[in-house]
Amino acid sequence: MAVRKFKPTTPGQRHKIIGTFEEITASVPEKSLVFGKRSTGGRNNVGKMTMRYMGGGHKRKYRLIDFKRNKDGVPAVVKTIEYDPNRSARIALLFYADGEKRYIIAPNGLQVGSTLVSGANAAPEIGNALPLENIPVGTVIHNIELRPGQGAALVRSAGNFAQLTSREGKYCVIKLPSGEVRQILSACKATIGSVGNSDHGLESSGKAGRTRWMGRRPRNRGVVMNPVDHPMGGGEGRASGGHPRSRTGLYAKGLKTRAPKKQSSKYIIERRK
């Protein structure tokens, strides 16, 4: 996908960079795979704010995505490639040979009319989902499971990809987009290729209003708050705020926040950068 800039006929157009949507082939989603989605506004079940800077935005409907790819051996044809307001990647509608319809994350290079299949006997081609033990070393992958049959949990956002670097016994060594190198069970599934919409990171809203349409509220800096509101607030005039901290007092910009005794740490060979 490419991006396009605009002539600065208005202040909001001057810095606006958005996608061209040239790969989108359908404007109406599959009705059987769409459900209502209520906006939380960053509040939990008792109404307490648990995430700041969320609220408003355009109404969205949730598209049910197949992250498990468990219809092994059943071929599917790519019917459409669609926009999904709930994620940065595009989604593809699959029509299976037995009549079932499912959405998947659209990988880079996927075309309408392509035939996809999942399972141990599938060819390592773009869009096919295979167990890691059946994927050649060095292959670029995405939608990676952490536990067999659980569904893809890693490498799902636009433009991302991981690489299968080696095998060690019943584990495969994967290099993730963050730079982390970790072991994952060879029975876990992954999809061949990288996630589509790779130019998403180049986009710029251009104006505050477009950001509000996305459901993101203004983000205020801690150093301009009062001491009651933030550890970095207060002071006479423009103060530096001291050591960078989060609102809850954790050191920012360098503090490792991962739990030191986390069970899964034994699978991490090299920490993320």
Swiss-Prot record:
> Which Gene3D superfamilies has this protein been placed in?
2.30.30.30, Nucleic acid-binding proteins, Ribosomal protein L2, domain 3
**Gene Ontology cellular component terms for the protein in this record:** large ribosomal subunit
Does the record bear Ribonucleoprotein in its keywords?
Answer: yes
The UniProt GO MF terms for this protein read: rRNA binding; structural constituent of ribosome; transferase activity
Pfam families attached to this UniProt entry:
Ribosomal_L2, Ribosomal_L2_C
Q: Which keywords are on file for this protein? A: Ribonucleoprotein, Ribosomal protein, RNA-binding, rRNA-binding
InterPro entries, per the entry: NA-bd_OB-fold, Rib_uL2_dom2, Ribosomal_uL2, Ribosomal_uL2_bac/org-type, Ribosomal_uL2_C, Ribosomal_uL2_CS, Ribosomal_uL2_dom3, Ribosomal_uL2_RNA-bd_dom
One GO BP: cytoplasmic translation
- Compositional bias segments (type: Basic residues): 209-220, 255-264
What are the boundaries of the region Disordered? 196-273
| Keyword Ribonucleoprotein belongs to the record | yes
Subunit and interaction comment:
Part of the 50S ribosomal subunit. Forms a bridge to the 30S subunit in the 70S ribosome.
What is the role of this chain? One of the primary rRNA binding proteins. Required for association of the 30S and 50S subunits to form the 70S ribosome, for tRNA binding and peptide bond formation. It has been suggested to have peptidyltransferase activity; this is somewhat controversial. Makes several contacts with the 16S rRNA in the 70S ribosome.
Q: Which family does it belong to?
A: Belongs to the universal ribosomal protein uL2 family.
What is the protein named? Large ribosomal subunit protein uL2
